[in-house]
């Protein structure tokens, strides 16, 4: 069963990804524990806040955080855009699926997946079967605002990046919802407030397992 949680009531703008990540690492203290050590997987569009929120959740829960894109970069020794340039999207997706298959076997982690990780049916199966999946959702306008200055997004290197985001959202959102146990509307809430709002939702969901 998928629960939809709207956490958009805050009025403050979400900091930049770099600022929010620093807040997550430096300011969030351990706040809670979950009854199980099931891994928590974050899915959603680029710019939805998977890395930032993932780091904050890991800090709050005292867990290890893994960013799948960063894991791929560490394995390949180059940035994601370079992998795309050399091997194309198909080559990147193959590497992504291999890394996902390995990372999802680890207990007690917070894993931020890439925006397109859900495209492969086998990846979706692994996410559903091996952990708790949070779909971090934001509007196309908010996604565009957050990614407009980011040059590390090869799929947005187009003449109309906002239109590309909209097309990707139409294609991918049904897949995010297919695997999601919880849908979290990230909105424009400060990262610390957002993390504190997500934690009780996770605790309530785990108690039902």
Swiss-Prot record:
GO terms for biological process: amino acid biosynthetic process; aromatic amino acid family biosynthetic process; chorismate biosynthetic process. Pathway: Metabolic intermediate biosynthesis; chorismate biosynthesis; chorismate from D-erythrose 4-phosphate and phosphoenolpyruvate: step 5/7. Gene3D superfamilies: P-loop containing nucleotide triphosphate hydrolases. Its cofactor is Mg(2+). Its main location: cytoplasm. SUPFAM superfamilies: P-loop containing nucleoside triphosphate hydrolases. GO terms for molecular function: ATP binding; magnesium ion binding; shikimate kinase activity. ATP binds at residues 47-52, 153. It comes from the Bacteria. It catalyses: shikimate + ATP = 3-phosphoshikimate + ADP + H(+). InterPro entries: P-loop_NTPase, Shikimate/glucono_kinase, Shikimate_kinase/TSH1, Shikimate_kinase_CS. One of its GO terms (cellular component) is cytosol. Its EC number is 2.7.1.71. Keywords: Amino-acid biosynthesis, Aromatic amino acid biosynthesis, ATP-binding, Cytoplasm, Kinase, Magnesium, Metal-binding, Nucleotide-binding, Transferase. Mg(2+) binds at residue 51. Binds 1 Mg(2+) ion per subunit. Belongs to the shikimate kinase family. PANTHER family: SHIKIMATE KINASE, SHIKIMATE KINASE 1, CHLOROPLASTIC. Monomer. Catalyzes the specific phosphorylation of the 3-hydroxyl group of shikimic acid using ATP as a cosubstrate. This is Shikimate kinase. It comes from Bordetella avium (strain 197N). The lineage of its organism: Bacteria, Pseudomonadati, Pseudomonadota, Betaproteobacteria, Burkholderiales. The gene is aroK.
